[in-house]
Design a protein with these regions (language model features):
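N-terminal export/assembly segments and adjacent metallocofactor-ligating motifs
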Residues: 1-163, 172
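Active-site phosphate/pyrophosphate-binding segments
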Residues: 136, 140-217
Length: 217
C-alpha cells in the first residue's frame, strides 16, 4: 500500500458505500464490544443510510461475562458505561480501563478527575496480576493473582454492603475509602467471570455511584 490522507480514505470509503448501495452489495462494520452510546448512534445512522450494512462484533478477549451480568441485572445486553470524572475514588480489579478495556475511551474522564482541585484529585487503586496502563497510573497498585482478585472483589462487596472487615489490610483500606466516598466511589472489573461482574455491579449500586449510570449503556 501507500500513504494516504484521511480525506483520501473518506472519499474512497464513501464511494465504495454508495456503490454497494446501488448494487445491493453487503457492507460489514467490524468492531469490538463497546460501551459507547454515541458510537452506537453513529453505527445505527450508517445502517439506516446503507440498509445492507451488518454490524459484526468481535472481541479478541471476550466480554460475554460482562454482557451476561449486565443483562441479568438490567434486562439489556450491553456493557456498563462509566464517567470517571465523577469519581473521587476508583477501585479497578483487573480492568485496564486506560487501555482497550470495553473498547477504551475512558481516559478523558479519568484525566479530568486527576486534575487537582482545591488540593484534591481522584484516588485510583489498581488490583491486577500484570502491569497495565491503568496500573502504571494508579496511586496504589496491589499485585494479586486472578483468584486473589476475585476474593478481593468479594471482600469489597461485604465491606461496603454489610460493614465486614477484610483480612487483607490493603483491601480493607480500599474498602474504607470507597465507603467514605459514597456516591463518589466506583468499582470496575475486567475479570472474565460472570459472578465477579455481578459483584462489581452490586457494589456500584450499593454506593449509588455517580460514575456508573446503567441508563447510558
Amino acid at each position: 500500500g501507500k500513504d494516504a490522507t484521511w480525506a483520501d480514505v473518506n472519499t474512497k470509503v464513501k464511494a465504495s458505500l454508495e456503490d454497494a448501495k446501488a448494487k445491493g452489495g453487503n457492507v460489514v462494520v467490524l468492531t469490538n464490544t463497546m460501551a459507547s452510546p454515541s458510537t452506537d448512534v453513529l453505527i445505527a445512522s450508517l445502517t439506516a443510510k446503507y440498509p445492507t450494512t451488518k454490524h459484526v462484533v468481535y472481541d479478541a478477549v471476550s466480554e460475554s461475562n460482562a454482557l451476561d451480568a449486565f443483562q441479568a441485572v438490567y434486562g439489556v445486553r450491553a456493557l456498563a458505561n462509566y464517567d470517571f470524572s465523577k469519581a473521587d475514588v476508583i477501585v479497578s480489579v483487573g480492568a485496564d480501563f486506560l487501555g482497550d478495556w470495553q473498547g477504551g475511551g475512558f481516559d478523558a474522564g479519568y484525566a479530568q478527575g486527576r486534575i487537582p482541585k482545591n488540593g484534591m484529585m481522584s484516588k485510583h487503586i489498581q488490583i491486577e496480576s500484570n502491569m497495565s496502563l491503568a496500573g502504571a497510573n494508579a496511586d496504589v497498585r496491589i499485585p494479586m493473582t486472578v483468584a486473589q482478585q476475585k476474593q478481593a472483589l468479594a471482600d469489597l462487596y461485604y465491606a461496603v454492603v454489610s460493614g465486614a472487615q477484610p483480612k487483607n489490610t490493603q483491601i480493607a483500606k480500599a474498602a474504607k475509602q470507597l465507603k467514605d466516598a459514597k456516591s463518589k466511589g466506583v468499582v470496575v472489573t475486567g475479570l472474565d467471570d460472570v459472578n465477579a461482574q455481578l459483584v462489581a455491579l452490586a457494589i456500584n449500586n450499593a454506593l449509588q455511584s455517580e460514575a456508573f449510570n446503567p441508563s447510558d449503556a
